[in-house]
């Protein structure tokens, strides 16, 4: 019976079984590599981003060939001495097995988990992708799965590489010895493909077919021939059609002029303290790729939609948004979407308001409700979120306002706050997170912070990083939220600095920020170090301990407690003191060396001297390497469903 099942299982595997990793010797090696991926019709641009865990700028394309080229960091695994890069894959259907579903999705670029588990919709699978690092003769190596008809000569011509190079890298002795499904490494001197224009994500719809053909579901050969034979009538049709187009353009110009005139008169003459805005009432706010169409260039009014004029505080008027403008909703829409702000829709309370679940224009959203006295924080969050867009940052959709209240509308992040999944999760109806999931969440949050610190046109500090401001989506991927305290960082000759009054949450505040009010990216890194300690220990940022000689309990920062513990844990082989502070909900299902590395990284992040703290780029690299090691550890526990599910069952 077992043999029959095994043979049946093998028969289901795709034809990409010949993909093999590239061997390596230097386990400290880290390089940039590319993966050539040809998506199927169900894999949109946003799906590809998620599958490979990359940003849009990390993807180039060869549109004519139908290929995307994904840039990934590649490293040498310490156990197998093979080059790989990691990602996660969310299974969509309860069909087949994890192995063949994963291999098929990545078209042979993946080295999936060695498991015979059945695929389960919603399950998150850790996947190793096959990559390579150049020996120094070329700038990059690109992983490419051979297709039917490929040859060394055709690949040489397509990618502008000599045949000798391809043969040398892949050890090809026979030019005809290339089989469809083989994994090849293409040496490159420059980035392949061209930058992918986001406007190509949703191509325009094709012209409609004639009604008679649509009724039958196709266009017959007779219809095609009839069209071809009617060439003598084309000039007359062109003339009539041209006149129709000109007339339509004239009508459109008149409508545009009317719209522009009405917008120039939109300022309130009756109230000198306010501005009048046109409010969209019926338009949707989701684009075809599934992302939120939140902040858009130009005016946010729609000529074919019902409009309403409302008064909005002058601080939110002209000049608040430099380029992009968020969508604006009516108070009535917000009130109806949240079921009149019912307690059953309440998601939680933040520093500056309450957050409610809402169903707005048939889409799930989160709505932050603030008093009008919080205009400064409201404006700060709107301005930042209209400039930063990243898969690990919560997306802004729009806002609404009345004389007394302000409302910010965000994407709804289904699993809620990380805090609820770390601190006594069972009492909140949550299942404890596994080690792999905690590692991935830490990396996601680090990437979001790295983005606002390093990769935006103007750099920002968040100033309120904590586990309640890190949200988890349905796949348990992390997104940073609540930018009400975010601050622009100015570059000076002595580095970056932003002088401000001290704001934030006790337990996460860096020493220099508390004493001098100097907010820098290193302030965020200190707070992130505290988050890492919470992820390891499952404890809150401030712990109540029994004070000696007094009746009142003492409140101590988690960072100071963990630093004291680490003094008695010099390495991963002698970490008995540290193990006492590891979250018992993980039930000892974690690699001790990886946990010790994250604890050490957290220790570096909370160093009293901000100069000695790593930057977020270094933190991301460290967490990526730790996750790779954790995945190797996970592979040794292939039969343990508690590890692979991402959640720890039981207890």
UniProtKB/Swiss-Prot annotation:
Residues 341-628 form the Protein kinase domain. Residues 142-186 form the LysM domain. GO terms for molecular function: ATP binding; protein serine/threonine kinase activity; transmembrane receptor protein kinase activity. The modification Phosphotyrosine is found at residues 410, 513. One of its GO terms (biological process) is negative regulation of defense response. ATP binds at residues 347-355, 368. The active site is at residue 464. The keyword Glycosyltransferase does not apply. Its EC number is 2.7.11.-. Residues 1-19 form the signal peptide. It comes from the Eukaryota. Gene3D superfamilies: LysM domain, Phosphorylase Kinase, domain 1, Transferase(Phosphotransferase) domain 1. It is found in: Cell membrane. The keyword Kinase applies. Belongs to the protein kinase superfamily. Ser/Thr protein kinase family. PANTHER family: CHITIN ELICITOR RECEPTOR KINASE 1-RELATED, LYSM DOMAIN RECEPTOR-LIKE KINASE 3. Putative Lysin motif (LysM) receptor kinase that may recognize microbe-derived N-acetylglucosamine (NAG)-containing ligands. This is LysM domain receptor-like kinase 3. It comes from Arabidopsis thaliana (Mouse-ear cress). The gene is LYK3.
């Amino acid at each position: 019976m077992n043999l029959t099942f095994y043979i049946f299982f093998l028969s289901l595997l795709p034809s990409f079984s010949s993909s093999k990793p590239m061997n390596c010797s230097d386990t400290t090696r880290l390089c940039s590599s590319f993966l050539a991926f040809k998506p199927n019709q169900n894999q949109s641009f946003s799906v590809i981003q998620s599958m490979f865990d990359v940003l849009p700028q990390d993807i180039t394309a060869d549109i004519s060939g139908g290929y995307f080229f994904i840039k990934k960091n590649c490293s040498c695994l310490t156990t197998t001495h093979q080059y790989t890069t990691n990602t996660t894959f969310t299974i969509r259907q309860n069909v087949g097995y994890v192995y063949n579903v994963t291999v098929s999705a990545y078209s042979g670029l993946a080295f999936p988990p060695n498991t015979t588990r059945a695929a389960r919709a919603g399950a998150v699978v850790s996947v190793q992708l096959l990559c390579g690092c150049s020996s120094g003769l070329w700038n990059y190596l690109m992983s490419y799965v051979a297709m039917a008809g490929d040859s060394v000569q055709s690949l040489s011509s397509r990618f502008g590489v000599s045949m000798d190079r391809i043969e040398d890298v892949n050890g090809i002795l026979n030019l005809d010895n290339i089989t469809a499904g083989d994994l090849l490494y293409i040496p490159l001197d420059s980035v392949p493909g061209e930058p992918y224009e986001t406007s190509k994500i949703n191509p325009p719809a094709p012209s409609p077919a004639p009604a008679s053909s649509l009724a039958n579901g196709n266009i017959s050969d007779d219809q095609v021939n009839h069209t071809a034979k009617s060439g003598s009538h084309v000039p007359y049709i062109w003339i009539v059609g041209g006149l129709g187009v000109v007339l339509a353009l004239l009508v459109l110009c008149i409508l545009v002029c009317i719209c522009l005139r009405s917008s120039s008169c939109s300022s309130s003459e009756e109230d000198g303290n306010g501005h009048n805005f046109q409010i969209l009432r019926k338009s949707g706010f989701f684009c075809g790729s599934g992302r939120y169409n939140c902040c858009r260039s130009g005016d946010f009014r729609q000529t074919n939609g019902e409009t309403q004029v409302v008064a909005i505080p002058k601080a939110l008027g002209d000049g608040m948004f430099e380029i992009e403008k968020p969508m604006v909703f009516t108070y009535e829409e917000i009130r109806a979407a949240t079921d009149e702000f019912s307690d059953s829709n309440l998601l939680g309370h933040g520093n500056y308001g309450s957050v409610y679940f809402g169903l707005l224009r048939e889409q799930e959203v989160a709505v932050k409700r603030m008093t009008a006295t919080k205009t400064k924080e409201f404006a700060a969050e709107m301005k930042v979120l209209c400039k930063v867009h990243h898969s690990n940052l919560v997306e802004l959709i729009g806002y609404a306002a009345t004389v007394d209240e302000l409302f910010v509308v965000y994407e709804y992040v289904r699993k809620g706050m990380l805090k609820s999944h770390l601190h006594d999760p069972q009492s909140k109806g949550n299942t404890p997170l596994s080690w792999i999931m905690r590692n991935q969440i830490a990396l996601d949050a680090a990437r979001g912070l790295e983005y606002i610190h390093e990769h935006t046109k103007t750099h920002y500090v968040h100033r309120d990083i904590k586990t309640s401001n890190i949200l988890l989506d349905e796949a348990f991927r992390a997104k940073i939220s609540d930018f009400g305290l975010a601050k622009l960082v100015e570059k000076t000759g002595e580095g970056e600095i932003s002088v401000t009054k001290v704001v934030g949450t006790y337990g996460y505040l860096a020493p220099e920020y508390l004493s001098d009010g100097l907010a820098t990216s290193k302030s965020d890194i200190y707070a992130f170090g505290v988050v890492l300690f919470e992820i390891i220990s499952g404890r809150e940022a401030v712990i109540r301990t029994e004070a000696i000689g007094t009746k009142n309990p003492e409140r101590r920062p988690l960072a100071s407690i963990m630093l004291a513990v680490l003094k008695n844990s010099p390495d991963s082989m002698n970490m008995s003191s540290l193990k006492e502070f590891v979250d018992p909900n993980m039930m000892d299902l974690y690699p001790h060396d990886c946990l010790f590395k994250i604890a050490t990284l957290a220790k570096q992040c909370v160093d009293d001297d901000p100069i000695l703290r790593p930057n977020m780029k270094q933190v991301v690299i460290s967490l990526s390497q730790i996750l790779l090691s954790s995945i190797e550890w996970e592979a040794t526990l292939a039969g343990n469903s508690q590890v692979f599910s991402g959640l720890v069952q039981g207890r």
